[in-house]
C-alpha cells in the first residue's frame, strides 16, 4: 500500500510541476499589439507627445480628457462635464466592455487622452484601448514572477499609469518602474527602484511633475524602510530620493530631515525596517511647486516593539510637503503620532481653496485611516481643523492648539484579552452571552483597514462636499506573545489570536455583522456629515463627482451606481457582475460624455474578510464604459456551483488542531481568509481536492506551486506545523460539510 501511495504521490508531484510550469512567469516582458493602421499610430503619437505639465495644469480647458490620476494635479476627481445629469442619468447604458483576462483585484483609475484610454490591471499589466469602442490597441505584460506576489500584503493590484510626452509609465508589483511607448507599448526604459533582497512592492500610480516621474512603494507589514523616488522621464535616471523614516543612526543621515526624525525614535527600529512606505496618495500644487506625499504605518505595527521608548516616530502617518525638483523637505503634519494601529496617512489627499472664517485658504484635505477628517493649510502645514467621520475608540478629539490627537485611556493595547486564557468552549460561551453591541464595544475602532482606505474620495466645487467611501470595522489589537521578527513574513507584533473566528456560527455571525461601509457626504468647512448612504457591504469603490450634480461609485454587491450629489438619492444602477473597488472617471468624445470604471473584485478586504459578508463575487476583470442610450449588454454569468469534496478524516488531537489554527492565521489567513473562508479571490482551502491533500506538505514546505505564487513556507513552518495547519483546514472542511450538507 505504501508503494502505491508513493507512486501516486510522485505522479501527482510530476504532473503538478509540469502543469504549473506551463504557466510560469519569467522576467521577460511581453507586448501584445493588435492590428492598427498607420493613421491610428500617428494619431496616438500626435495626441500624447504634447501631454505635459502645462496641459495638466490647464486641464479644465479640455474637460473631455482625463489627463492625470485625479484628472488634475489637485486630485479632486471632479469632472466638469454635464451632458449626463440628474434628469437623464436613468438613460445611461453600457457603451462597451473589455475583458482584461485577469482574476485578481482591479483598482486602476484610467487615463484618457483624446480618445485613447490607458489603464492597468493586476500583476501590473498595462492596456491601451480605443476609448470610443473598447478595442484593444496594445497590451503590455511586465512578466512579474508570480512568487513575488507573496510580498504584496493586499493583492497584486495596480492603481494606474501616468502618461507624459508620448510615453506611459507604470510601477510593477516587483518594484520596477517602466516607461512604454504610448503608441506601441514597446519598452523605452525599465529601472529597478528597490532592494530586491527585501519584500518591497509597488501598487500605486506614478505621478509626473516637471519631467520627473515620482514613485513610492509598499511593504511595511513585512519590515521595510519607506521612501519616494524621482526619475528622469526621458532616461530613467534617478534624480532624488526622500526617505520617510530614519535608518541606522550610526551611519550618516541622508538629509537634515532624517537627522531630526531620528530624535523621535527609540530602540533598534532600523533592524525591522521602520516602515513609512508611500504606497498610494500624492498631490501637487503647481503655484507653490509643492509635492505632497502620504506616509504609511510603522513596521512592525506595535510601537512597543518598534520603538519601545515611545516617541512620535516621524514621518510615520504623516502628510509631508517636498520640493519636487530636489526632494527637499518643506513641512509635515503627523496625523497619528507614535502609530501603533496601522493608521496610515497614505489615503487620498485633495487640494482646494475654501473660505474658512471669512478667509480664502489654500487647503489640503484628507480622511486617513485614523478616523479624523483633516483640513490643513497646504502652504505652511498649519492645522486648521479635524473632526471624526466614523465612530472611534482610540482618541476623543484633536486638540485645536497643538493639532495632536488626544488618545483615550484604552487606546494602546498593552493589556491582554482575558478571554485568550480560557479554553475555546469557555470563550464561545462568554461571547455567545454577549450582545453584538457588547462585543463591538470590546474592540478597537477603527481597525487596520481604517475609516477610509485607498479608495479615492472626490470633491464637488458645486456642492462643496467631499464624498468619502468610508468603513466602520472594529478590530482586536494586543501584544503578540514572544514576537520574533521574520524576514519576508508579516511582522505586526499584534496577537493573531484576537482575529481568529471562534468556529461557533452564532458568535461569528455577530462579529461579521459589525462590518459596515457607507458614503459620507462631508462638509469640510463646518466639519460635519451632511448625509450618508449605508451600503450592504463594506469594501466599496472610489468616488467620482460631476458637474451634472452626480456622484458615481461601484460597490461590493456588484453594482455600479449613480446618486444625486446634493442629496444622495440613488438615481441609476447597473450590474457589474463583480465587486467594484476602483474609482470611476468621465470623459467626452465627439460630443458624447462617457463614464468608465474598471471592475474586478479583490484587494485587502477581499482576501482577509470578505467571506463575512456572504457574497459569492468572482474577480471578473473588465473595463466598463457607459453613455446615454448605450445598448450593449454583458454576457450572462455562468457560475459552476462549487461542490465540497469529501474531506479526509481528521487525524489530530484538539491541541494539535488548536496549534494549527494559530499557525494558519499567522501565515495563511491573510490570503486564504480567516477561518479558512475565502473572500473569492484566492482558493478556499476547504474545497481542496483529494490530490491536493496528498501533496499538502509538498505545496506548503516544498514550494511546488511557487510558479503560481504559492511559495514555500519551510523557513517559518516545521513539518509538525504544516501537519497541524492541514488538520485544522480539514476540520473546517468537516465543519462546513456538517453545516451545509455539502
Label each PLM-derived region with a short phrase.
Residues 338-340, 345-348, 390-394, 445-447, ...:
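Conserved blade-ending motifs and adjacent loop-strand segments that build the rim/top face
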Residues 215-226, 266, 293-313, 473-512, ...:
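Short, conserved, GDST-rich strand-edge loop motifs in beta-rich repeat architectures
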Residues 44, 54, 639-663:
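Electrostatic cytochrome c docking/interface patches
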Residues 171, 714-742:
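C-terminal capping alpha-helices of c-type cytochrome domains
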Residues 661, 673-705, 711-712:
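Gly/Gly-Pro-rich "capping" loops immediately C-terminal to redox-active cysteine motifs
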Residues 585-641:
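Blade-level signature of beta-propeller repeat domains, shared across WD40, Kelch, NHL, RCC1
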Residues 32-100, 135-149, 186-195, 237-245, ...:
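Aromatic (tryptophan-biased) beta-strands that constitute blades/sheets of beta-rich domains
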Residues 66-70, 105-125, 150-176, 201-222, ...:
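Repeat-blade elements of multi-bladed beta-propeller folds
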Amino acid at each position: 500500500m505504501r508503494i502505491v501511495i508513493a507512486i501516486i504521490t510522485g505522479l501527482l508531484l510530476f504532473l503538478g510541476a509540469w502543469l504549473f510550469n506551463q504557466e510560469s512567469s519569467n522576467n521577460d516582458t511581453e507586448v501584445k499589439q493588435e492590428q492598427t493602421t498607420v493613421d491610428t499610430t500617428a494619431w496616438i503619437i500626435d495626441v500624447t507627445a504634447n501631454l505635459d505639465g502645462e496641459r495638466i495644469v490647464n486641464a479644465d480647458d479640455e474637460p473631455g480628457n482625463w489627463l492625470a490620476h485625479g484628472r488634475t494635479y489637485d486630485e479632486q476627481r471632479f469632472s466638469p462635464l454635464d451632458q449626463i445629469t440628474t434628469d437623464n442619468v436613468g438613460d445611461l447604458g453600457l457603451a462597451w466592455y473589455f475583458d482584461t483576462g485577469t482574476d485578481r483585484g482591479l483598482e486602476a483609475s484610467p487615463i484618457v487622452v483624446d480618445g485613447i484610454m490607458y489603464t492597468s490591471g493586476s500583476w501590473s499589466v498595462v492596456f491601451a484601448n480605443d476609448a470610443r469602442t473598447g478595442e484593444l490597441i496594445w497590451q503590455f505584460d511586465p512578466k512579474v514572477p508570480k512568487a513575488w506576489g507573496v510580498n504584496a500584503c493586499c493583492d497584486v493590484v495596480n492603481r494606474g499609469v501616468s502618461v507624459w510626452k508620448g510615453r506611459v509609465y507604470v510601477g510593477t508589483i516587483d518594484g520596477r518602474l517602466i516607461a512604454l511607448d504610448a503608441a506601441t507599448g514597446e519598452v523605452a526604459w525599465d529601472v529597478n527602484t528597490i532592494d530586491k533582497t527585501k519584500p518591497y512592492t509597488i501598487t500605486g500610480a506614478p505621478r509626473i511633475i516637471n519631467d520627473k516621474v515620482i514613485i513610492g512603494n509598499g511593504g511595511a507589514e513585512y519590515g521595510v524602510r519607506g521612501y519616494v523616488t524621482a526619475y528622469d522621464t526621458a532616461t530613467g535616471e534617478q534624480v532624488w530620493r526622500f526617505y520617510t523614516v530614519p535608518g541606522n543612526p550610526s551611519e550618516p543621515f541622508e538629509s537634515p530631515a532624517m537627522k531630526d526624525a531620528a530624535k523621535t525614535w527609540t530602540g533598534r527600529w532600523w533592524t525591522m525596517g521602520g516602515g513609512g512606505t508611500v504606497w498610494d496618495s500624492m498631490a501637487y500644487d503647481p503655484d507653490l511647486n509643492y509635492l505632497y506625499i502620504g506616509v504609511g504605518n510603522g513596521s512592525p505595527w506595535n510601537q512597543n516593539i518598534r520603538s519601545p521608548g515611545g516617541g512620535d516616530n516621524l514621518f510615520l502617518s504623516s502628510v509631508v510637503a517636498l520640493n519636487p525638483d530636489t526632494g527637499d523637505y518643506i513641512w509635515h503634519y503627523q496625523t497619528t503620532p507614535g502609530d501603533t494601529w496601522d493608521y496610515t496617512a497614505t489615503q487620498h489627499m485633495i487640494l482646494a481653496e475654501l473660505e474658512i472664517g471669512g478667509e480664502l485658504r489654500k487647503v489640503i484635505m484628507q480622511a486617513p485611516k485614523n478616523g479624523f477628517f483633516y483640513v490643513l493649510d497646504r502652504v505652511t502645514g498649519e492645522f486648521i481643523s479635524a473632526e471624526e467621520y466614523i465612530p472611534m475608540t482610540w482618541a476623543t478629539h484633536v486638540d485645536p492648539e497643538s493639532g495632536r490627537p488626544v488618545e483615550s485611556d484604552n487606546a494602546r493595547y498593552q493589556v491582554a484579552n482575558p478571554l485568550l486564557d480560557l479554553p475555546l468552549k469557555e470563550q464561545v460561551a462568554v461571547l455567545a452571552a454577549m450582545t453584538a453591541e457588547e462585543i463591538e464595544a470590546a474592540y478597537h475602532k477603527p481597525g487596520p483597514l481604517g475609516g477610509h482606505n485607498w479608495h479615492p474620495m472626490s470633491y464637488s466645487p458645486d456642492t462643496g462636499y467631499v464624498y468619502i467611501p468610508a468603513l466602520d470595522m472594529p478590530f482586536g489589537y494586543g501584544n503578540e506573545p514572544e514576537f520574533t521578527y521574520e524576514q519576508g513574513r508579516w511582522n505586526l507584533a499584534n496577537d493573531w489570536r484576537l482575529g481568529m473566528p471562534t468556529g461557533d456560527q452564532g458568535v461569528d455571525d455577530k462579529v461579521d455583522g459589525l462590518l459596515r461601509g457607507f458614503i459620507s457626504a462631508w462638509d469640510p468647512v463646518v466639519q460635519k456629515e451632511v448625509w450618508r448612504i449605508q451600503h450592504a457591504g463594506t469594501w466599496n469603490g472610489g468616488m467620482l463627482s460631476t458637474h451634472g450634480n452626480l456622484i458615481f461609485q461601484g460597490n461590493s454587491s456588484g453594482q455600479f451606481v449613480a446618486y444625486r450629489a446634493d442629496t444622495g438619492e440613488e438615481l441609476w444602477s447597473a450590474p457589474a457582475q463583480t465587486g467594484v473597488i476602483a474609482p470611476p472617471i468621465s470623459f467626452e468624445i465627439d460630443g458624447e460624455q462617457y463614464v468608465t470604471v474598471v471592475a474586478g473584485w479583490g484587494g485587502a478586504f477581499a482576501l482577509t474578510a470578505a467571506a463575512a459578508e456572504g457574497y459569492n463575487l468572482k474577480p471578473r476583470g473588465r473595463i466598463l464604459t457607459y453613455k446615454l442610450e448605450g445598448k450593449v449588454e454583458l454576457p450572462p454569468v455562468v457560475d459552476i456551483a462549487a461542490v465540497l469534496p469529501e474531506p479526509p478524516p481528521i487525524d489530530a488531537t484538539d491541541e494539535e488542531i488548536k496549534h494549527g489554527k494559530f499557525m494558519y492565521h499567522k501565515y495563511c489567513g491573510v490570503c486564504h481568509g480567516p477561518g479558512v473562508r475565502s473572500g473569492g479571490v484566492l482558493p478556499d482551502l476547504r474545497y481542496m481536492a483529494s490530490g491536493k491533500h496528498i501533496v499538502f506538505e509538498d505545496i506548503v514546505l516544498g514550494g511546488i506551486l511557487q510558479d503560481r505564487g504559492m511559495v514555500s513556507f519551510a523557513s517559518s513552518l516545521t513539518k509538525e506545523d504544516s501537519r497541524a495547519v492541514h488538520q485544522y483546514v480539514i476540520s473546517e472542511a468537516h465543519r462546513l460539510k456538517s453545516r451545509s450538507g455539502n
